[in-house]
From Swiss-Prot:
Protein name as catalogued: Protein OPG034
Underlying gene: OPG034
Similarity comment: family membership: Belongs to the orthopoxvirus OPG034 family.
InterPro entries: Orthopox_C1 (IPR008724), Poxvirus_Bcl-2-like (IPR022819)
Pfam family, one: Poxv_Bcl-2-like
Inducers of expression: Expressed in the early phase of the viral replicative cycle.
UniProt keywords, alphabetically: Early protein
Domain of life according to the entry: Viruses
Length: 214
């Protein structure tokens, strides 16, 4: 039974006895509510993880802990009701992220952004900046978005659909905006795969440098 006491003690009580492999399993499988940069995957400690969870979810530590152990297939009892369909919350790191940093992959950023748009999750500062591309796409590509939606409704995918985005220095950001508008319709996974298919690694790198310079 998890007692409703100090959140730090609750979390540390259960994390401190985990093996390193189990702890890595938490990091890699709990992506619905945790985001760690490449650097943090190898350097984060249990204490740091606990402090971030407590800071970001002060009223939901029991729930977060229960989800962690469900991920690990460990049956535990809790003194709270865990909803069967929890509305995903912003990832720990991304909820407060206000700027792009070099150790964050652009693909991770875009993947989470599309998921947040599809699932109507509140956006952090950096995502709000990126969301301006979606708003711009709604105004600029209304007809094209309608055609893309018709294509998807007919075929169930956008594999052979050519995005109506002219190739210029704004190609990556405009592609993100266009696909973000479609994300609630086609799903964030298909929107993300279309982004990977359509935007080259070089264009992604250029766009990441642009984000880092702001």
């Amino acid at each position: 039974m998890i007692m409703s006491t100090d959140p730090n003690n609750i979390l540390m009580r259960y994390l401190k006895n985990l093996t390193d492999d189990k702890f890595k399993c938490i990091i890699h499988q709990s992506s619905d509510f945790l985001y760690l940069s490449d650097r943090d995957y190898t350097s984060i400690t249990k204490e740091t993880l606990v402090s971030e969870i407590v800071e970001e979810y002060p009223d939901d530590c029991n729930k977060i802990l229960a989800i962690i152990f469900l991920v690990l297939d460990k049956d535990i009892d809790v003194d709270i009701d865990i909803e069967t369909k929890l509305k995903p919350k912003p990832a720990v790191r991304y909820a407060i992220l206000d700027k792009m940093t070099k150790d964050i992959k652009l693909t991770d950023l875009v993947r989470h952004y599309f998921r947040y748009i599809e699932q109507d999750i509140p956006l952090g500062p950096l995502f709000k900046k990126i969301d301006s591309y979606r708003i711009r796409a709604i105004n600029k590509y209304s007809k094209e978005l309608g055609l893309a939606t018709e294509y998807f409704n007919k075929y169930g995918h956008l594999m052979f659909y050519t995005l109506p985005i002219p190739y210029n220095r704004f190609f990556c950001r405009n592609s993100i905006g266009f696909l973000a508008v479609l994300s609630p319709t086609i799903g964030h996974v298909k929107a993300f795969y279309k982004f990977i298919e359509y935007v080259s690694i070089d264009d992604r790198r250029k766009f990441k440098k642009e984000l880092m310079s702001k």
